[in-house]
């Protein structure tokens, strides 16, 4: 297992990434603030989801990827040749996907799955407590406490997405990545998940990709505007969305392109 990286900042330095020889990300430099919601916005195809997947090395699953630069957690470069513990990395940097992806097992086992992989809370009583704690944290406990052994596939899509978030939380991450995590949900479920993120930032640093500017305006503390694989503007969300400095940002917010 890699050295302890807990409570250390996540920083991107001079990151360049190409797929099949085509540049996707160009000289990205970012520091993600602790215990804040960072929203990454920009037009379709600008590299938002690619950047998110690079942060926990899920981009490794894409063929013909070339990447250079640094993604630092504290003093450790997670894309360096010496970094190999991807299981531990993905525990610390969890991902909530665009579409809910519950595992084909019970609700209880979905929450417990990561703990078992990482050898956490090995006593049955401890695991029971963890499942209840994190189901409560995402507002699911009262809804499912009497059917924990039922298939997670029977949950509504909104419940499934909260369960996926719960699965990430149960292994005690430092960062939560969310890739369009509400785009497949109805408005009520979307609001529930948004409210959860706002509550969870007390204990986690949350990095979200969203195509919905309204969502970013509602919940972002910090904003990153990407365009054609480049960071155009970053800063406090109120400043970026209310008084942008860059002309491209102003045009994007005005709907000139999307």
Model-derived features with residue positions:
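Conserved ABC ATPase "signature" region
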Residues: 70-77, 124-146
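ABC ATPase NBD coupling module
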Residues: 66, 77-94, 117, 240-244
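Catalytic Walker B motif of ABC-type/P-loop ATPase nucleotide-binding domains
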Residues: 176-179
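Conserved catalytic motifs of ABC-family nucleotide-binding domains
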Residues: 172
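Helical segment within the ABC ATPase nucleotide-binding domain
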Residues: 190-202
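Conserved ABC ATPase signature
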Residues: 149-155, 159
């Amino acid at each position: 297992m890699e050295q302890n990286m807990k409570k250390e900042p996540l920083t991107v330095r001079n990151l360049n990434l190409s797929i099949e020889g085509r540049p996707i990300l160009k000289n990205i430099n970012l520091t993600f603030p602790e215990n804040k919601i960072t929203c990454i916005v920009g037009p379709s195809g600008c590299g938002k989801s690619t950047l998110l997947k690079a942060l926990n090395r899920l981009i490794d699953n894409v063929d013909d990827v070339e990447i250079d630069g640094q993604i630092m957690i504290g003093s450790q470069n997670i894309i360096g040749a010496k970094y190999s513990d991807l299981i531990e990395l993905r525990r610390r940097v969890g991902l909530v996907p665009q579409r809910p992806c519950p595992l084909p097992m019970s609700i209880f086992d979905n929450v417990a799955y990561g703990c078992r992989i990482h050898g956490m809370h090995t006593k049955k009583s401890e695991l029971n407590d963890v499942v209840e704690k994190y189901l409560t944290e995402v507002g699911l406990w009262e809804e499912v406490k009497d059917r924990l052994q039922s298939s997670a596939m029977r949950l509504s899509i909104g419940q499934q997405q909260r369960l996926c978030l719960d699965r990430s939380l149960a292994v005690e991450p430092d960062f939560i990545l969310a890739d369009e995590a509400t785009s497949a949900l109805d408005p009520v479920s979307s609001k529930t998940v948004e409210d959860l993120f706002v509550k969870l930032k007390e204990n986690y640093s949350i990095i979200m990709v969203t195509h919905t500017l309204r969502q970013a305006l509602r919940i972002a503390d910090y904003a990153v505007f990407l365009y054609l694989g480049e960071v155009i503007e970053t800063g406090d969300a109120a400043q970026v969305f209310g008084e942008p400095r860059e002309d491209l940002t102003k045009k994007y917010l005005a709907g000139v392109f999307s």
